[in-house]
């Protein structure tokens, strides 16, 4: 019986403090949500094992503190990432306006071989608050931002209600796997092919 290949994927989650990055991770990995807010200091990661088709995947999800003083965590933290997840709070305009900075921060620090093809995904979190009546960033506005950045995949989520959490992380895993395959192709000798630009997620 052949041994199935196990793949380690590194995913980095970026966004302002308080947008729910840690809550999304905990809901996905531990099926838990806490009402108490505790700021992440520096960086931390959790792992989750899953199977995609015939691949055994270990998803290593890195959570960063969103405070400005922790924004530059160092090149080593970003390098080797297979996917970058950007998170904002649909009820907090500043967290949406900060997305450009986080997007640029990642590209500058991680220096992906093909920035236009590198997989990003955007999560608009906390859609459950006040039944959606408190939101200040529309889905249309978020999707327009994604289109400007090369058709980034977008999900609206609620860590508290476990809304779209599993679906979004499954998509993240598939995007990361696709990026890993593109990197394998890139390093093959005598190839003139360029990794295809992302357009969506076959979730």
Swiss-Prot record:
InterPro entries: P-loop_NTPase, Small_GTP-bd, Small_GTPase
Cysteine methyl ester PTM sites in chain numbering: 203
Short name of one Pfam family: Ras
Tissue-level expression: Expressed in xylem cells of inflorescence stems.
Residue spans crossing the bilayer: none
GO cellular component: nucleus; plant-type vacuole; plasma membrane
Consequence of changing residue 22 to N: Dominant negative (GDP-bound form); inhibits autophagy and tracheary element formation
Lipid-linked residues (S-geranylgeranyl cysteine): 201, 203
Membrane topology listed for this record: Lipid-anchor
GO function terms (MF aspect): GTP binding; GTPase activity
UniProt GO BP: positive regulation of autophagy; programmed cell death involved in cell development; protein transport; tracheary element differentiation; xylem development
CDD domains (UniProt xref): Rab7
Additional detail: Plants silencing RABG3B display a significant decrease in the number of both protoxylem and metaxylem cells in the basal region of inflorescence stems.
Reported function: Intracellular vesicle trafficking and protein transport. Functions in autophagy. Involved in xylem and tracheary element differentiation.
Subunit text: Interacts with VPS39.
Protein name: Ras-related protein RABG3b
